[in-house]
Amino acid sequence: MSLITTLARMEAVREGRAQPLTTVRHRHLSERPLAFVPLTTAGEAGAPLGALVGTDRDAPRLLIVAQPRDRDLRFAFLAELAEEIQPYLDSYADEVELEERKETDPETGKKVPVQVELCADAPQLLVPSAAGVAFVRLLGRSMRFRRTAEQDPETPFPAPARVPLLGRWLTHYGERSRVPGSCLLLSLTELLSRHWATGQSHLEDQHLGSLLAWIDPPEGVPGAEAALRAESERDEHGLLRCPPAGPATDPAFDNQLLAPAMSRYDAARAEASQGVAGAEARLRLAEAELRGLIASQLRPTWDALWHGVDLLRSLPEGARVAERWKRDRWSYTAHRDRVRAGEPPQPKRDDAVTAAQKLAARETAQAQLDAHEALDDPLVMAGRRLAGEAFAGEVIDVEMAWSEARVPRPRPLITVRTEDRPHLAERVKLHRVLADGRAQSGEFVGFARTDVAAGTDGTDGATGTGGADRAAGTDGTTGTGGADGAGGAGDADGPGRALVVRLTGGMGRGKQPEPGSVPEKGDRVCWTLFEHAPRGGPELPDPESTPWTHGGPPDAAAPAHGPEPDPMTEEDYL
């Protein structure tokens, strides 16, 4: 937790209301997202109980499993879920735009430009909490290997074609959600807690009702009191007034209402199977009762989810959010192409190379996300400045200098007065954004005494004898004009310290820097110690070239998905 986040949480406790951590929204929100609010059955690992799903906040589709221990009813639920979600996922697949990218020519091995399709937009799924994201992954894992009648006419329990297809898409979305900054599958609690700091712990922020109570409390009610009500207030029957956001249910609801209703449903179903008169009507009433009970637990969470979306939409979108969303569109397009090409579903386990590629991609994405958020948001940048990872200040002197190469290049020395305390060392690389959006690089030279840098003796301290030009000395010696080298004592700990930065890039190819590429005296500048567009590491080998230290090349004769599972028994179909 950063210092500025800690301060914001303390401020939230004092004010009784969540405090903003950002000035802009750092995640993309689709114009028509699909909300998915699931519930699972207590005591049945991964067994769905019901769900609200849809793109219309006023008309969600309610799906239930009246008896989660019944395999046929669970499969019917998955089929209904596929009928509801898969058309939404497919609706973005055909509207495309052409993009030019470079690909390796298989004949020449050279990079050549090619025209490829990129979906103009991508579907977005919203779930209430991080537990909902985990349940989406679980659904994908349980659905994508189901066999259809077309694939295996002899399979005892064939699934509709959309069920394994939806499983593949949910698996892809679940994997994509692990990439920092991805917005294909979003947890609303994670999204809200990124943009607001509450007076409670991160674990307590996973309760959607409690989190919203801090961000938007009722009039005249402190956030802590409103959050406590949302977490634990019960009615006269002992039931939570604000049901949990799922997928787990409230034990009191399970014991007092759900279990008796399921017993009545089971009894009516048994009577109906025996042909008892009036049993069909009782079965319909029992199912309607279950639908009402499950809806009573889902609808408050559904409304809270859309309330959170409204709060997030009140923030303007960050400048670099569209760039990250484009990567999500590429990801969606690539998976669409794999599905259309008839490729098999994702394996249960990644091979060594694929796993390493995923980890490297996520590390790069995290570094890019951190940089983008700081560059888009002065409040986030303030946190980086407090952490010593950036500094901002006023340019108090500019001295033109050139490199000593055969073709001299401009290497101006910029003296910046700042109140920040960055973690600088000799020749540390620095980065800033120019007015046209390009990145400019520099390096830290040393500290300059503020009285000399300000030219109190009638001259520009940085250009006086032994000034900033002597500060360029990397041996840490002190120039006679009062500017210390990077290794010297300098004025690092005094108020209003002055730092000398040498520009090393972003000034064009000529001997003279391009207009606007060198800051002028009096300009406000912000330098960062982190790269603005970090890149990944070296390319990894093909799976066929996997070294023996990581298992060697995959064996074509070995099972594709690890060891064979135990044979199926009757207990597997309970």
Describe the function of each predicted region:
Residues 426, 432-435, 441, 451-454, ...:
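C-terminal effector modules of nucleic-acid-centric enzymes and ribosome-associated factors
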Residues 37-42, 67, 127-130, 419, ...:
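Structural motif
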Residues 7-10, 280-423:
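Accessory interdomain/linker segments of ATP-dependent helicases and helicase-like nucleic-acid enzymes
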Residues 453-492:
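Long, intrinsically disordered low-complexity tandem-repeat segments
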